[in-house]
Amino acid sequence: MDPNCSCAAGGSCTCAGSCKCKECRCTSCKKSCCSCCPVGCAKCAQGCICKGASDKCSCCA
């Protein structure tokens, strides 16, 4: 179960404007999502929908 989503790990879910899923894929954007995308973040660059730049990116920690 994804801690930030109501879906199983590796499963799919629907995300509205803000996607916080880490272990599942969002059907609304067809791929994994990051809430931020700082420069040099390899994980965010690999298929994430970036919502905005930030130095504090939980998906890239």
Curated annotation (Swiss-Prot):
Annotated spans, Alpha: 30-61
What positions does the entry give for a divalent metal cation 7 binding? 50, 57, 59-60
Cellular compartments per GO CC: cytoplasm; nucleus
Residue numbers of N-acetylmethionine PTMs? 1
Residues reported in the UniProt entry to bind a divalent metal cation 3: 15, 19, 24, 29
- Residues bound to a divalent metal cation 6 are 37, 41, 44, 60
Binding-site list for a divalent metal cation 1: 5, 7, 21, 24
MF (Gene Ontology) = zinc ion binding
Q: Which residues carry this modification: Phosphoserine?
A: 58
Q: Does the keyword Acetylation apply?
A: yes
Keyword Metal-binding assigned: yes
Q: Where does a divalent metal cation 2 bind?
A: 7, 13, 15, 26
- Annotated GO biological process: cellular response to zinc ion; negative regulation of growth
Keywords for the protein's UniProt record, in alphabetical order? Acetylation, Metal-binding, Metal-thiolate cluster, Phosphoprotein
This protein's domain notes: Class I metallothioneins contain 2 metal-binding domains: four divalent ions are chelated within cluster A of the alpha domain and are coordinated via cysteinyl thiolate bridges to 11 cysteine ligands. Cluster B, the corresponding region within the beta domain, can ligate three divalent ions to 9 cysteines.
What the record says about family reads: Belongs to the metallothionein superfamily. Type 1 family.
What do we know about how this protein assembles, alone or with others?
Answer: Interacts with EOLA1.
What this protein is reported to do is described as: Metallothioneins have a high content of cysteine residues that bind various heavy metals; these proteins are transcriptionally regulated by both heavy metals and glucocorticoids.
Q: What is this protein called?
A: Metallothionein-2
